[in-house]
From Swiss-Prot:
Its cofactor is Mg(2+); Mn(2+). This is NAD-dependent malic enzyme 1. The active site is at 101 (proton donor), 172 (proton acceptor). Gene3D superfamilies: Malic enzyme, N-terminal domain, NAD(P)-binding Rossmann-like Domain. The keyword Phosphoprotein does not apply. Belongs to the malic enzymes family. It comes from Vibrio vulnificus (strain YJ016).
Length: 562
């Protein structure tokens, strides 16, 4: 654990020091520091510990009634005193994660311009495309190692939010630090402002982004390319996480850059990794393998197809053929089951179509096969929702699945809560408590006939902080598919249900540091094995992970000149 006792030498003093969130201690500055840094009279007389500050901050937090007000309050602390912010969040991680990230962050993105207080990260506008290098040089953090970037076009299940999408990179990087121990000094949220096609945003006098229809096609690609090249010039070793890009751009960008730079797409690969890890744990708890499951997806976009491909890869690693694995995965979108010969399918969807030979004897009352048709005929053991369309896991669908599967695995993963395919209480009730449920957004435990059923949040926060920590620990040059698969396997080994046969599918968030370190070790080991990181011994790797794991504690300050 990186708990360095050495002093930090700081060139700032007075109001400038108090206005620097990474360095500000507020009332915790010692008497000696107050003299050295010209802070006397700028703070109340009492010197407090960080725990005393946390207690006051938590009291203030509890005084707010709405989740949005709580979100704004926490963001204000983050922009004032980052060490205090992360200590507060770590002390109350289960309570506050839904406030700093999903589901509350969705509303914060929709209202970004209305609740704006202070700039954070970088806004890289298409209008300023000739000055991207200068913009990157303006970043307040100089030693950047992790970047989360969005263009705001597909924010959660809420669509095009323009620069309002900045709330997602800010929230994601908060979790890199709170869950994965990555110092906030190493992080940078970025939004690529290429305009918006959201008429509400364009008509809103408060909207702060570039008022222009979205740039598309070759102009868009050239802009992203110039941005990537500028990042490579400024921070050549930084990990870039692509976040909430629209389907038409997400997969092409990933394919274009994954073998050129150290990057991944959390919506596609992070969601896939946490889902595969959760499914592996569920299968282990049931004494079966993932390769023995029949899996139906509702939602065949880049996220759904990314999960499907990761599941297929794990099935193949368990010993079945790629052809056999694909025959057990059924993708359903708004037009029904994806089948060979369907028009207008994207390349990544084409790889997941079902053969007519599989569906030739299926029964249906209409052209094509609906979700209910697929459940009746394919008889899935796993049902995964990534559609962003609420309520489509109906009672009829769930109970039809339950007819032929005594322990159905149901993952309605769409975010935010308002977009979930079915609420856990209904799924538990419809299956008389037999279903194993995990969701994308947080839900309270369900009580059914006197028994309590914990509802696990199958959230990417179990995965991406550990991936980032592993990449940083060995300075990996790429994020490979095999590294992501190792993250899934490491997560599965943390499952209380798989280990003990009881309890929740995933560990509680209070254990997220242990989970992230285990994932980091597995990811880093695979990076070394694949030659995308320098080789180090296992014990040295453990030390490197601990040394990179930042904790929110105040360091002693000594004054120095610029």
């Amino acid at each position: 654990m990186n708990n360095d006792k050495r002093p930090l030498y700081i060139p700032f003093a007075g109001p400038a020091l108090l206005s620097t969130p990474l360095l500000n201690k507020g009332s915790a500055f010692s008497a000696e520091e107050r003299i050295s840094f010209n802070l006397e009279g700028l703070l109340p007389e009492t010197t407090e510990t960080i725990q005393e500050q946390v207690e006051r901050a938590y009291m203030q937090y509890k005084a707010f009634e709405s989740d949005m007000d709580k979100h704004i309050y926490l963001r204000n602390i983050q922009d004032t005193n980052e060490t205090l912010f992360y200590r507060l969040v770590q002390n109350h991680i289960t309570e506050m994660m839904p406030i700093i990230y999903t589901p509350t962050v969705g509303a914060a993105c929709e209202n970004f311009s209305n609740i704006y207080r202070r700039g954070r990260g970088l806004f890289v506008s298409y209008a300023n495309r000739d000055r991207i290098d200068d913009i990157l040089n303006n970043a307040s953090n100089h030693n950047v190692k992790v970047i989360v970037v969005t263009d705001g076009e597909r924010i959660l299940g809420l669509g095009d939010q323009g620069i309002g999408g900045m709330g997602i990179p800010i929230g994601k990087l908060s979790l890199y630090t709170a869950c994965g121990g990555i110092s906030p000094a190493y992080t940078l949220p970025i939004v690529l402002d290429v305009g918006t096609n959201n008429p509400q945003r364009l008509a809103d006098p408060m909207y702060m982004g570039w008022r222009h229809p979205r740039i598309t096609g070759a102009d868009y690609d050239a802009f992203v390319e110039e941005f990537i090249q500028a990042v490579q010039r400024r921070w050549p070793d930084a990990l870039i996480q692509f976040e909430d890009f629209a389907q038409k751009n997400a997969m092409p960008l990933l394919e274009r850059y994954k073998n050129r730079i150290c990057c991944f797409n959390d919506d596609i690969q992070g969601t896939a990794a946490v889902t595969v890890g959760s499914l592996m744990a569920a299968c282990q708890a049931a004494g079966s393998k993932l390769s023995e499951q029949r899996i139906t997806f509702l939602g065949a976009g880049s996220a759904g197809c990314g999960i499907a491909e990761a599941i297929i890869a794990q099935m193949v690693s368990e010993g079945i053929s790629d052809k056999k694995a694909r025959s057990q995965v059924f993708m359903v979108d708004r037009w029904g089951l994806l089948q060979e010969g369907m028009p207008n399918l994207l390349d990544f969807q084409q790889r997941l179509v079902q053969k007519h030979s599989v569906t030739a004897k299926w029964e249906t009352e209409a052209n094509g096969f609906s979700l209910l048709d697929v459940v009746k005929n394919a008889k899935p053991t796993v049902l995964i929702g990534v559609s962003g369309a609420p309520g489509l896991f109906t009672q009829e669908v769930i109970q039809e699945m339950h007819k032929h599967c005594p322990r159905p695995i149901v993952f309605p993963l769409s975010n935010p809560t308002s977009r979930v395919e079915a609420v856990p209480a209904d799924i538990i009730r419809w299956t008389n408590g037999d279903a194993l449920v995990a969701t994308g957004s947080p839900f309270d435990p369900v009580i059914h006939e006197g028994k309590t059923y914990p509802i696990v949040q199958c959230n990417n926060s179990y995965i991406f902080p550990g991936i980032g920590l592993g990449v940083l620990a060995v300075n990996a040059k790429r994020v490979t598919d095999e590294m992501l698969m190792e993250s899934s396997r490491a997560l599965a080994t943390c499952s209380p249900l798989a280990i003990n046969g009881k309890g929740a599918l995933l560990p509680p968030l209070e254990e997220i540091h242990t989970v992230s370190k285990r994932i980091a070790y597995a990811v880093a080991k695979k990076a070394i094995e694949q030659g995308v990181a320098l080789e180090i011994a296992d014990d040295a790797l453990q030390v490197a992970i601990e040394q990179h794991f930042w904790q929110p504690v105040y360091r002693r300050y000594k004054r120095t000149a610029f």
